[in-house]
Amino acid sequence: MKHLTSAEVRQMFLDFFKEKGHAVEPSASLVPHEDPSLLWINSGVATLKKYFDGRVVPENPRIVNAQKAIRTNDIENVGKTARHHTFFEMLGNFSIGDYFKEEAITWAWEFLTSDKWIGFDKELLSVTVHPEDEEAYEFWAKKIGIPEERIIRLEGNFWDIGEGPSGPNTEIFYDRGEAYGNDPEDPELYPGGENDRYLEVWNLVFSEFNHNPDGTYTPLPKKNIDTGMGLERMVSVIQNVPTNFDTDLFVPIIKATESISGETYGKDNVKDTAFKVIADHIRTVAFAVSDGALPSNEGRGYVLRRLLRRAVRYAKTINIHRPFMFDLVPVVAEIMADFYPEVKEKADFIAKVIKTEEERFHETLNEGLAILSEMIKKEKDKGSSVISGADVFKLYDTYGFPVELTEEYAEDENMTVDHEGFEEEMNQQRERARNARQDVGSMQVQGGALRDVTVESTFVGYSQTKADANIIVLLQDGQLIEEAHEGESVQIILDETPFYAESGGQIGDKGYLRSEQAVVRIKDVQKAPNGQHVHEGVVESGTVQKGLHVTAEVEDHMRSGVIKNHTATHLLHQALKDVLGTHVNQAGSLVTENRLRFDFSHFGQVTKEELEQIERIVNEKIWASIPVSIDLKPIAEAKEMGAMALFGEKYGDIVRVVQVGDYSLELCGGCHVRNTAEIGLFKIVSESGIGAGTRRIEAVTGQGAYVEMNSQISVLKQTADELKTNIKEVPKRVAALQAELKDAQRENESLLAKLGNVEAGAILSKVKEVDGVNVLAAKVNAKDMNHLRTMVDELKAKLGSAVIVLGAVQNDKVNISAGVTKDLIEKGLHAGKLVKQAAEVCGGGGGGRPDMAQAGGKQPEKLEEALASVEDWVKSVL
């Protein structure tokens, strides 16, 4: 057997089947396209369902692929076994009604045993077949020539997922030798049994039956082949290594993690688990983000968040206490660059997403662990071994702990979590959110008699803001009426209207309905259940009756502001993609006459320079006087043109395409300017984060932008007056003041350091000798954790050999820092373990390296007790 790299194995598989007349199907995105039944692409065949179920006929019925996949159903085993993964590659060859068992078996054997290809020793291969699949048995025994003792009949060799195509399968196993099992009494030591010696390297599924609803099986008119070979497992056999993690797909990641942690892989099972978890999870997250998924609290995003936070938890066991996963992205990208160049191309963005998520979790991790420690203690004191659903929800909602992460921490303490109670809390939160969404005035038009109103009403407001119309429906408080009088609120449906009804982020129009006998001021317009525009207003004069002929007129000033802001929103969307990356997608918007608000997907803050660039691009497009064209097109044609559609939005067969020159192309039902020059000016007012992976920009256009800029100039003039300088000199004057402030701060820190030295010197008298070891545990005055660590370092230097624990109270919170000199570390003393037990006394938690560690607590009144416990801990270790 030749030694091959993982890249060579993958390419060799594709090349082999290409020679056999197969078309190479590119690896599809991990995020399923038009398949709501799947959270992730989880197998090689998942992307080919359209061919197998007959929706699409492939140009070539023979297909081969190398497909990336994600499965997280066994996540708790990842890192603890040799071959469990959340991300993996599946190599497969497929036949859609073309060849069948004979070719599939013959080619599999050729690929595995031919010296031109893999070159396995034939004597080390065994196969399993279904007991009733005599055809496959005969092919293996007579055509291939495998001895009968190496053909095992197993009942489990039948692929069936319920109703639909099914059939027997045959699996090929490689014997790795007696080093992986040689106990003749082991009942599982056979190909297909639970053992490490005989590894399954290929599964060939013969899809020849239809599983009927009544439970019977009938032959399929066209028989298919579906095979799967796990690349990671195959490479472990070819490279002759004990686990998948020892292959060239993982080793570079593990080595990079060794460099970050200072620990060594292969010396300790607990630490090895951490290395494996990190190596597996970074591959999954990097590829998923590359394909457009982002961490969040739902769906795919929740999976990514859970994986990242699980990796952070395990990283602590190898002394990594900072964001680090993002540093591994270039390593993953390099390993996979030949076949998956997109990860390398997007490496900077992927790293940015991961770093942001890590930083967010680290901000709450220690505090969350302290809370969890309290929860565990509370339950144990009650004699309970279950963390309540309410507590699990608090950790999830406040501190970002996925329930599975809390469960893993609980397992360390021999406890479980109340999943049912947690789900109940989650459902209550969803109900609260749903009620909040529904508690809006616009929903009032959806009830009552409107459900039964089916008369037609035509919207003409794209081309005009004024129209003659008749009142065809008149309502008050949701009930049909014949007339309304001055001062009364009404809802009106016209046979024809220029008023836009709120949708797609654009607010409803305002204006007037006028006739000789009445005037109605329209305050809002919403869509009725059957699509008509419902005008909500107040009768300002006269009497309004059903059938009344009116002139409907939208406020020109209001509509003018709305259309400027709406077209500017389209320009902003494209500018965001240009500057921040193509991952940016609209997550929500609001378009009013005075301002626009645009929510978008993006990780990390948008820098000042990026905002300036975005604003400049939008203004350049405005000043370029670009025509805006609007057309109705079939949805397929619009998508082919590259029109941006809102994710999750439902569109009909014919869609409205809004195009701004060759710069922006979107599906949109809103109102727009005819030329970008009409917008005049665009000014960003604010940019902020509104949730995990979602940012918000608020901006103004036209007259609003002019007013905003004038306001900023006014503030600048006022600042210049206060600084007694002119506008141009303000930055210099501010810089000078900042320099003066820094000098004052440095002087203050110097004085604090001197005071710290004095205090450090003063507490040397508190040093005690415990079993021949200098131990110093004292409460001190320190403004923050950095100050506390500095004092510990100074005392270590002065004492030469000592265990030091200093505690301070700041803003009703406890800070503790511990230090152990090198000579005492060799005796088994560990600062991280010491500070953890001290912090627990104060209702907190923490940890760190053997020589230096820190922790926090929430009960300052127990600090003295915590410091007093240090001597006993040292004695227990020595």
From Swiss-Prot:
Zn(2+) binds at H566, H570, C668, H672. Binds 1 zinc ion per subunit. This is Alanine--tRNA ligase. It catalyses: tRNA(Ala) + L-alanine + ATP = L-alanyl-tRNA(Ala) + AMP + diphosphate. It comes from Bacillus subtilis (strain 168). Belongs to the class-II aminoacyl-tRNA synthetase family. InterPro entries: aa-tRNA-synth_II/BPL/LPL, Ala-tRNA-lgiase_IIc, Ala-tRNA-ligase_IIc_anticod-bd, Ala-tRNA-synth_IIc_core, Ala-tRNA-synth_IIc_N, Ala-tRNA_ligase, Ala_tRNA_ligase_euk/bac, DHHA1_dom. Signal peptide: none annotated. One of its GO terms (biological process) is alanyl-tRNA aminoacylation. Its main location: cytoplasm. Keywords: Aminoacyl-tRNA synthetase, ATP-binding, Cytoplasm, Ligase, Metal-binding, Nucleotide-binding, Protein biosynthesis, RNA-binding, tRNA-binding, Zinc. One of its GO terms (molecular function) is zinc ion binding. Consists of three domains; the N-terminal catalytic domain, the editing domain and the C-terminal C-Ala domain. The editing domain removes incorrectly charged amino acids, while the C-Ala domain, along with tRNA(Ala), serves as a bridge to cooperatively bring together the editing and aminoacylation centers thus stimulating deacylation of misacylated tRNAs. One of its GO terms (cellular component) is cytosol. The gene is alaS. Its EC number is 6.1.1.7.
